[in-house]
Amino acid sequence: MIYGIIVSHRNVGHGILNALVGMYGDVDCLVSLSNEGLSTNELADNIREAARFAGEEGVCVFVDAYGGSCWRASKLARLRNAHVITGFNLPMLLSFVTKRATIPFGELPAVLETDGKRGIRIE
């Protein structure tokens, strides 16, 4: 099973995961990690620990901001068979939950990027 880890500043990831559960129901394929009170190395350790549940199919690490401590920790974790996807939003995560079982792991990031961008509108 393809697994997802949300890595964010403070409670951003927890909040978006809670919203996703409210929309979709139980989401056992995603976990949220916060950087609050952690060094970059400690957060990288937590990411590695969370990735153990991913198995061989792969893990998508969703990071809130490029270049920040969460992104650095995600890169420092050096996960095998992983995609680090920066700039997540609710439509992207909903797409992950609903499509991860039907789209090959190598193609999934492009689909998620498209769906995430599709969820952004200026009116």
Language model features with spans:
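N-terminal loops that bind phosphate or other acidic moieties
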Residues: 1-123
